[in-house]
């Protein structure tokens, strides 16, 4: 049963200090305010097309950006906060949502395809889970720290598990983050499969934990992954 205290560690935030907390709040809050403005302008009709907001997950991205230094980034369709937290310029993101040529995908990718050469962020095509094997391939080629984020339904795609196995076999410097909201559109996990993502990862001898989306927990375990 998932809960707000899943995997919690007492007093963990104190181990990171005030500067980490301030940077975390600054990045997460900036993303939240940006997203609220996007929502407001979409409702008023200034933004056309689907909008994939990061509201509610901004501090996940903020924590990852503080724990990982200049990785290759392969996010999912909700990539606004990931882009902003890792230092992406908000103006090209704004312009992308407005469909302008000055957008980060030249105004043709839209909300789900956020990319930036400046922060090594690769856009998502919309194909469920495709970012995982792409991230593994890029990491294998460049041997550079890599981050990929995907949802709980994406891990069920048949090309994701082999990508995890390839990463383990080749000891690649890659961090996999599965953002699990227990839903694939409107279908609960228990109606889709009988196994847990963390068990799949552990079966491959990966360092893997099932935790709540607490930013200090995320940073703590990402540091553990890097150490291992």
Predicted regions: what is each one?
Residues 170, 177-228:
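Thiamine diphosphate
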Residues 149, 176-177:
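Residue-level marker for buried hydrophobic side chains located in beta-strands
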Residues 23, 33, 59, 162, ...:
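Generic recognition of stable, solvent-exposed alpha-helical segments in well-folded globular domains
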Residues 25, 150-151, 184-185:
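Short, contiguous strand/loop micro-motifs
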Residues 36-39, 46-170, 188-205:
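Cofactor-binding active-site loop characterized by glycine-rich and histidine/acidic residues
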Residues 25-28, 64, 94, 164, ...:
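A generic alpha-helix structural signal
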Residues 1-67:
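Conserved acidic/glycine
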Residues 14, 24, 50, 84, ...:
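Hydrophobic alpha-helical scaffolding
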């Amino acid at each position: 049963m998932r809960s707000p205290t899943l995997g919690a560690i007492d007093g963990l935030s104190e181990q990171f200090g005030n500067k980490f907390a301030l940077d975390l709040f600054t990045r997460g809050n900036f993303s939240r305010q940006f997203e609220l403005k996007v929502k407001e302008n979409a409702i008023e009709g200034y933004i056309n097309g689907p909008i994939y907001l990061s509201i509610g997950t901004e501090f996940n991205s903020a924590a990852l950006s503080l724990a990982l230094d200049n990785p290759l980034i392969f996010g999912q369709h909700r990539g606004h906060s990931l882009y902003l937290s890792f230092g992406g310029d908000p103006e090209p993101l704004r312009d992308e949502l407005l469909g302008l040529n000055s957008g980060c995908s030249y105004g043709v990718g839209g909300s789900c395809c956020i990319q930036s050469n400046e922060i090594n962020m690769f856009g998502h095509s919309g194909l469920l889970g495709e970012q995982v094997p792409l991230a593994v391939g890029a990491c294998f080629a460049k041997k550079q720290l890599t981050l990929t984020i995907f949802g709980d339904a994406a891990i069920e795609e048949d090309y994701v598990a082999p990508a995890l196995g390839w990463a383990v076999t080749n000891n690649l410097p890659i961090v996999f983050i599965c953002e699990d909201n227990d839903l694939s559109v409107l279908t609960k996990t228990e109606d889709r499969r009988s196994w847990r993502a963390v068990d799949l990862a552990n079966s491959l001898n990966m360092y893997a934990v099932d935790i709540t989306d607490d930013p200090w927990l995320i940073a703590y375990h990402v540091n553990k992954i890097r150490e291992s």
